[in-house]
Design a protein with these regions (language model features):
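Beta-propeller domains
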Residues: 1-483
Length: 483
């Protein structure tokens, strides 16, 4: 049996060094400030870690097994727990004591015994709906977890309601209606153009299902919703199965193709879809979408080129780095040409956009994101005010980095943006992590409280906040103070 040894890939050095361990820490130390009394609930986070080295030198950061994290806030204290999501893939590799899966999402590069195996890693985000907690990755079905222990319950099709082969890692849980809006892309298998939109009611029962075809089989990492429309952007990061079968990348950048946006009726069917198109571009994450009369605005961290340079053109030619900027894309429902209007909102590079979740799909003022404008590798948490055009930021310090933030309302009916941001921070020079709590309306003032972790929590992708009463009742207690 070969020794376990990771490659010299920079991905596995420094902060990216695999953790490969599960942790339980009760009563984390609060090294600054005090935990707000109203913070009662759990911050769930999900990310990738490496169970075994792949033996390749071209691994990418979005691959790896799901490592699920939770920060539980209870009576002024915070506890931390992390657990592997024991997917079918994880269990196969555990039994084999080595990596069995090759290039990202390319089963033709797997070990022979894993060629036809389920490849889902459940490594991207956390979803809580109708009393159930899930770990998600967009090329597979959800995995249900115990919300208290994080032990894996198992892969699920939600009682037969998921009819596609895949399920998004960016669902939208509306905390006002308690509806779940989700989708599947390449829904009939690798390289298919099929996409499926799902609407589930507050009890987890499927209320609508709409199938249609994309212009090309591509990566659809995120989408957005309004009160009447579901917004699907299609960017030319395309799957060519001939390339995949030859051992190449699952996605390839095809700038000769156009960008397309489909507006799908939230409560209708495929006959009501509206189509728009523009030049080749890309985006990983949507901040929000809003309907304004006959127009639909999509606010997105927009790249004027390829957002995933590790998925180059089919000839392997490198694509130049292009920074993402907060941009508003507008679709006019009365337009005859289907053009997309583009308007940059902020001249500062940013990613991982979030909002006050109560205002997803509704008129809103505040957007939160990671801001990149330092030359020392550090990053900041930002709040953009759409009304004033101003940016408020919190910086953790030289060389330190922030992860995606999570907004928590101060009260169930507090005004939009009145609450806290929970922000995981990488204390790079110390080799450990913090969780900082910020006043969402005054980031520049610094943390309300800082919770110290005595360990390094490898960077996670996305997460969600679940109030304590929601874990027991299955329903969110929120109300809209104003729209």
């Amino acid at each position: 049996m070969e020794p376990v040894r990771f490659s010299e890939n920079a991905l596995f050095k420094g902060w990216g060094q695999p953790m490969r361990t599960e942790s339980t820490i009760e009563g984390l130390e609060v090294i600054q400030g005090e935990i707000p009394e109203a913070l009662e609930g759990t911050l769930y986070r999900n990310g990738a870690d490496w169970q075994y080295p792949s033996g390749r030198d071209d691994d990418i950061f979005i691959d790896g097994e799901g490592m699920f994290h939770m920060f539980r806030f209870e009576q002024g204290q915070v506890s931390y727990r992390s657990r592997w999501v024991t997917t079918e893939r994880y269990k196969m590799q555990k039994d084999a004591k080595r990596a069995l899966f090759g290039r990202y999402r390319n089963r033709y590069t797997n070990a022979p015994e894993a060629r036809d195996a389920n490849m889902g890693t459940a490594n991207t985000t956390a979803m809580f709906h109708a009393g159930h907690l899930y770990a998600l990755k967009e090329d597979d079905h959800p995995y249900e977890l115990d919300p208290d222990t994080l032990e894996t319950i198992g892969r699920t099709d939600m009682n037969g309601q998921i009819t596609a082969q895949t399920f998004t890692a960016h669902p939208k849980v509306d905390p006002i209606t308690n509806e779940l809006l989700a989708f599947a892309y390449q829904a009939k298998g690798d390289g298919s153009k099929d996409i499926c939109f799902y609407l589930f009611d507050k009890d987890g029962k499927k209320a609508n299902e709409v199938w249609f075809e994309m212009p090309y089989p591509c990566c659809v990492h995120d989408f957005a919703v309004t009160d009447e429309w579901i917004v699907f952007p299609f960017f030319p990061l395309i799957t060519d199965m001939d390339v995949v079968k030859a051992g190449g990348n699952y996605f390839q950048w095809r700038p000769e193709e156009e960008t397309h946006i489909a507006l799908v009726p939230r409560y209708g069917d495929a006959s009501g879809i509206k189509w728009f198109k523009g030049p080749a571009a890309s985006a990983g994450h949507m901040m929000n979408a809003v309907r304004e009369g006959d127009k639909v605005h999509l606010d997105v961290c927009f790249y004027e080129g390829n957002c995933f340079p590790f998925f180059p053109a089919p000839d392997g030619a490198e694509t130049p780095f292009v920074p993402p900027f907060l941009t508003r894309l507008t679709m006019d429902l009365t337009s005859n040409d289907g053009a997309i209007e583009k308007n940059r909102l902020l001249d500062v590079s940013c990613e991982m956009p979030r909002t006050d979740d109560r205002y997803q799909g509704r008129p809103y003022r505040h957007g939160f994101m990671i801001v990149y404008r330092s030359k020392d590798g550090s990053s900041s948490t930002g709040r953009f005010d759409f009304e004033t055009g101003t940016l408020d930021t919190y910086s953790p310090g030289p060389g330190d980095t922030v992860q995606e933030c999570q907004f928590v309302p101060r009260t169930p009916d507090s005004p939009e943006g009145d609450g806290w941001l929970l922000v995981p921070v990488a204390r790079v020079s110390e080799g450990r992590s913090d969780l900082v709590i910020l006043d969402a309306q005054n980031l520049a003032a610094g943390p309300v409280a800082t919770v110290k972790l005595p360990v390094r929590v490898r960077s996670t992708f996305h997460g969600t906040w679940v109030p304590a009463e929601t874990i027991s009742s299955g329903k969110y207690p929120y109300e809209l103070a104003e729209i």
